[in-house]
């Protein structure tokens, strides 16, 4: 979220590879994992399948990113650019709808089967035809069951053609094709395992069919995931084995890290992170994530529909105080709808707690003494704690905020039905393209109850024909520079006038043992890479 690409590149270089923020040499003997093995404590309870055409959770996406290849991957140092994965080169036709990819030579799957253009085309066709959750990502470029066989096809053994339903920004198309639903699977292997026309989905739930740097050795549900280096991979890999262990308790992760039983801990509390950095048992690296925590104000509530009230609420949050005392280092203040690391991100946080200014705005809105309103709150950290702090902030201007607790399913269902007053929750991007968030916060083509497009603006009944037009225009803009400028203009508009109080951006903090380097943690789990790991 920087105004210049040079400063953005500097930030993302720091983000993409975990480096030490704080470290002191260890002063006592400790156990250690083998030199060529990397052991990490994390949360594995989201796993229900290993099929990239079915996975739609965070850590499973990370697994897919390291076991499978795709055509391209976004360049984290400059999100307007892309690096070839199995694609050696690519081009776009004059109409802007035909994308031709030329593949590298001598690619092979873990099975030993040759990886050809037919595998690439079949993998994308398979994901669309299975029609699981990830198919929605590919639908973003117009691929559906009716057209995917025609629009995704091999031209020869080394060339694939993908045609979109209309002209999109090339950066958008490449972001979609560089995401996990477009992972390349071993067609020959999966057809041999196919049952009842399932494209091998039943078998792939517990096996793998990839060509990435690591292959699956063993998955024990709720316990561990073991990966082995693929010695036929095109790039050198230092780590022979990667072990992910399910350790739900932060305190246990800390003890394992301090004792040398693991090389990295992904889920330590802020206090634990500070402690292990101070005592020299670990190095802590922070990586901004593409997850925004925000308030949604339902404009069906006539009071919340008033622009002065919406602005007043933005001045009635003690952002810095909540960060300092509640979320600490796990979130940071962020008030625009594009997270750090996205094309066109805008670094602007103008709002702070200003009760006098908020009261003046409420008076202009006709509610000088405040009003009563409810907030649906997920009964989990940090949502409850943040909501309670905001409740106290609002009270300073006479606003009586009643908190309605519920589990995530309950609060989200009410939000999606537009039955809330205020909703506190988060929004995570599926892929690192600005449209992923602009579509949520600044796009509402049909505000009716029967709309087929029920994104965040719709959920808050915010009718925005002009912003919707701008979002559609940015989606089709071929120039990355002009596209970035369009998203910056939209962010300024939403920041100034919208029913969204965007509060914080999530920050992933990884604690690694001294001597560990190269764990690349991007803004989404799909961009976590083990390729450069060293000890």
What do these predicted ranges mean?
Residues 89-134, 155, 161-163, 253-256, ...:
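Aromatic- and charge-enriched surface segment that lines or borders ligand/interaction sites
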Residues 59, 220, 316-346, 379-391, ...:
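Detector for C-terminal structural segments
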Residues 39, 116-125, 157-163, 167, ...:
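Alpha-helical secondary-structure segments
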Residues 202, 229-275, 391, 400-402:
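Ligand-site clamp/hinge motif
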Residues 102, 139-192:
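Surface-exposed binding/hinge segments that line
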Residues 34-44, 88, 98-100, 120-124, ...:
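Short, well-ordered beta-strand elements
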Residues 41-94, 125, 207-213:
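N-terminal lobe/hinge region of extracytoplasmic solute-binding protein
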Residues 76, 178-237, 355-356, 360:
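Gly/Pro-rich hinge or "lid" segments in bacterial periplasmic/extracellular proteins
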């Amino acid at each position: 979220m920087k105004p210049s690409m040079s400063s953005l590149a500097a930030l993302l270089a720091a983000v993409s590879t975990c480096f030490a923020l704080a470290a002191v040499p260890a002063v006592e003997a400790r156990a250690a994992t083998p030199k060529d093995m990397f052991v990490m404590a994390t949360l594995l309870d989201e796993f229900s399948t290993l099929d990239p055409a079915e996975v739609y959770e965070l850590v499973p996406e990370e697994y897919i990113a390291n076991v499978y290849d795709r055509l391209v991957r976004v360049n984290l140092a400059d999100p307007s650019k892309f690096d070839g994965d199995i694609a050696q080169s690519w081009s776009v036709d004059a109409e802007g709808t035909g994308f031709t990819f030329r593949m590298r030579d001598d690619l092979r799957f873990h099975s030993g089967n040759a990886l050809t253009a037919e595998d690439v085309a079949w993998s994308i066709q398979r994901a669309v035809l299975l029609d699981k959750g990830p198919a929605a990502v590919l639908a973003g470029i117009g691929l559906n069951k009716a057209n995917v066989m025609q629009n995704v096809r091999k031209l020869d053994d080394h060339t694939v053609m993908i045609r979109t339903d209309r002209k999109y920004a090339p950066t958008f198309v490449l972001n979609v094709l560089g995401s996990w639903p477009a992972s390349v699977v071993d067609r020959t292997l999966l057809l041999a395992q196919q049952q009842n026309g399932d494209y091998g989905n039943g078998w792939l739930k517990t096996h793998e069919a990839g060509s990435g740097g690591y292959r699956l050795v063993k998955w024990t549900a709720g316990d561990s995931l073991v990966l082995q280096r693929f010695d036929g991979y095109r790039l050198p890999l230092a780590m022979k084995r990667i072990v992910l262990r399910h350790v739900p308790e932060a305190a246990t992760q800390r003890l394992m890290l301090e004792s040398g039983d693991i090389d990295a801990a992904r889920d330590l509390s802020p206090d634990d992170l500070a402690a292990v950095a101070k005592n020299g048992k670990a190095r802590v690296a922070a990586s901004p994530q593409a997850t925004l925590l925000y308030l949604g104000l339902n404009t069906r509530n006539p009071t919340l529909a008033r622009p002065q009230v919406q602005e007043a609420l933005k001045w009635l949050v003690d952002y810095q105080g909540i960060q300092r005392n509640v979320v600490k280092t796990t979130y940071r203040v962020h008030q625009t709808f594009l997270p750090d690391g996205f094309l066109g991100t805008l670094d602007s946080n103008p709002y702070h707690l200003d009760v006098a200014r908020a009261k003046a705005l409420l008076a202009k809105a006709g509610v000088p003494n405040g009003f009563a309103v409810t907030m649906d709150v997920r009964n989990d950290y940090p949502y409850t704690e943040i909501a309670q702090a905001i409740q106290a902030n609002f009270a300073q201007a006479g606003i009586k905020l009643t908190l309605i607790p519920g589990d995530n399913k309950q609060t989200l269902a009410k939000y999606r039905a537009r039955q809330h007053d205020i909703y506190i929750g988060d929004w995570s991007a599926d892929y690192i393209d600005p449209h992923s968030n602009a579509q949520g916060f600044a796009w509402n083509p049909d505000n009716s109850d029967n709309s087929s497009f029920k994104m965040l603006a719709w959920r808050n009944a915010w009718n925005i024909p002009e912003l919707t037009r701008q979002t559609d225009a940015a989606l089709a803009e071929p120039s990355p520079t002009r596209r970035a400028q369009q998203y910056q203009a939209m962010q300024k508009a939403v920041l100034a006038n919208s029913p969204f109080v965007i509060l914080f951006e999530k920050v992933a903090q990884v604690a690694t043992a001294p001597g560990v380097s190269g764990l690349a943690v991007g803004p989404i789990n799909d961009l976590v890479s083990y390729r450069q790991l060293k000890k």
